[in-house]
């Protein structure tokens, strides 16, 4: 059934849950200097995991809903209409810029049920590698350390194209309901 947080209702072509699509990445100012110093002292390599979840009856919105309190549709101040759910957020971008400047090696893991825009891998200096791990499950999570240590070769063929900019796809314009906040892809 349709609710405030799930327009269109569960199973609807135009349904999703605002809570489910909300991004909870802290801002760089939220990390203490002590935490950042300890992490840098621990390793020359930073591993950053970018995650998104969407799919049947929980489509990806064309805006980003940020961390806030309450349920249902977030206040306007918590909606970033300049970025889609499948792009990195401003908070993730700041984190990636920080680790790109600070660490000798930076590995980005994409833990997403959908194809994300990966153009940031070319535009943010210092990002060395990117591995799409999809939704790992228990077997996939066990394989990641072997891949990172070089014991397992993750080569394979992708069935999807990972675009620099999803809006350049001809299908992007013709999906969803047609307004800026509930047009899904």
PLM regions: where:
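C-terminal non-catalytic regions of proteins with extracellular/luminal or membrane-system context
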Residues: 1-185
């Amino acid at each position: 059934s349709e609710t405030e947080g799930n327009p269109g209702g569960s199973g609807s072509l135009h349904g999703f849950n605002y809570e489910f699509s909300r991004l909870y990445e802290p801002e760089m100012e939220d990390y203490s200097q002590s935490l950042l110093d300890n992490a840098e002292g621990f390793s020359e390599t930073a591993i950053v995991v970018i995650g998104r979840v969407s799919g049947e009856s929980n489509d990806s919105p064309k805006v980003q809903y940020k961390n806030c309190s309450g349920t249902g549709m977030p206040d306007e101040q918590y909606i970033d209409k300049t970025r889609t759910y499948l792009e990195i957020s401003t908070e993730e971008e700041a984190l990636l810029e920080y680790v790109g400047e600070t660490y000798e090696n930076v590995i980005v893991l994409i833990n997403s049920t959908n194809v994300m825009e990966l153009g940031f891998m070319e535009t943010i200096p210092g990002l060395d590698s990117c591995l799409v791990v999809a939704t790992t499950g228990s077997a996939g999570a066990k394989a990641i350390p072997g891949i990172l240590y070089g014991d397992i070769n993750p080569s394979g063929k992708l069935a999807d194209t990972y675009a620099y900019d999803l809006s350049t796809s001809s299908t992007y314009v013709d999906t969803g309901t047609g307004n800026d906040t509930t047009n899904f892809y």
